[in-house]
Amino acid sequence: MRALIQRVLEAKVEVDGQTTGEIKKGLLVFLGLGKEDTLEKGQKLIDKILKYRIFDDEQGKMGWNVSQANGGVLLVSQFTLMAQTQKGLRPDFGPAMPPSDAKALYEQLVEYTRSQFENVQTGIFAADMKVHLINDGPVTFNLEVEA
């Protein structure tokens, strides 16, 4: 399981011209699910994301998490994060969880995230999404939980 997190000033997801999720300051989280991933591993990753201190505190250092910064979370499924890219010139998506399983796990992780944090927005699983963002910094991190 992999998450690409970006500290943003604002972000939104559109599907067919309609906004499905939108936040102001906060975290844009792209989430990739692998074949061996579980709800337990996903919950550990979500907990880490919500506690990860990448927002400026009063001293201007990365000392606050998204809650302390009064931010939001925009959670977007992205199977391409699971691609193997070491060989060849085309990504291999073999390590990604099959869509039917991934959708169920993604929905459970959205529900879990909402149980842990108030301001959670999402994209639509497997939709052709347009993601708009203003990256703050830029500050971007790749977090991973091994399968």
From Swiss-Prot:
EC numbers on record: 3.1.1.96
Keywords, ordered alphabetically: Cytoplasm, Hydrolase, RNA-binding, tRNA-binding
Entry-linked Gene3D superfamilies: D-tyrosyl-tRNA(Tyr) deacylase
Subcellular location: Cytoplasm
Molecular functions per Gene Ontology: D-tyrosyl-tRNA(Tyr) deacylase activity; Gly-tRNA(Ala) deacylase activity; Ser(Gly)-tRNA(Ala) hydrolase activity; tRNA binding
Pfam family, one: Tyr_Deacylase
Positions occupied by motif Gly-cisPro motif, important for rejection of L-amino acids: 137-138
Top-level taxonomic group: Bacteria
GO annotation, biological process: D-amino acid catabolic process
A single cellular component GO annotation: cytoplasm
Keyword RNA-binding: yes
Main localization category: cytoplasm
Reaction(s) this enzyme catalyzes, per UniProt: glycyl-tRNA(Ala) + H2O = tRNA(Ala) + glycine + H(+); a D-aminoacyl-tRNA + H2O = a tRNA + a D-alpha-amino acid + H(+)
InterPro entries, sorted: Daa-tRNA_deacyls_DTD, DTD-like_sf
Subunit composition and interactions: Homodimer.
Free-text domain note: A Gly-cisPro motif from one monomer fits into the active site of the other monomer to allow specific chiral rejection of L-amino acids.
NCBIfam families: D-aminoacyl-tRNA deacylase
Family: Belongs to the DTD family.
Function as written in the Swiss-Prot or TrEMBL entry: An aminoacyl-tRNA editing enzyme that deacylates mischarged D-aminoacyl-tRNAs. Also deacylates mischarged glycyl-tRNA(Ala), protecting cells against glycine mischarging by AlaRS. Acts via tRNA-based rather than protein-based catalysis; rejects L-amino acids rather than detecting D-amino acids in the active site. By recycling D-aminoacyl-tRNA to D-amino acids and free tRNA molecules, this enzyme counteracts the toxicity associated with the formation of D-aminoacyl-tRNA entities in vivo and helps enforce protein L-homochirality.
Name of the molecule in the record: D-aminoacyl-tRNA deacylase
Native source organism of the sequence: Acinetobacter baumannii (strain ACICU)
Name of the gene: dtd
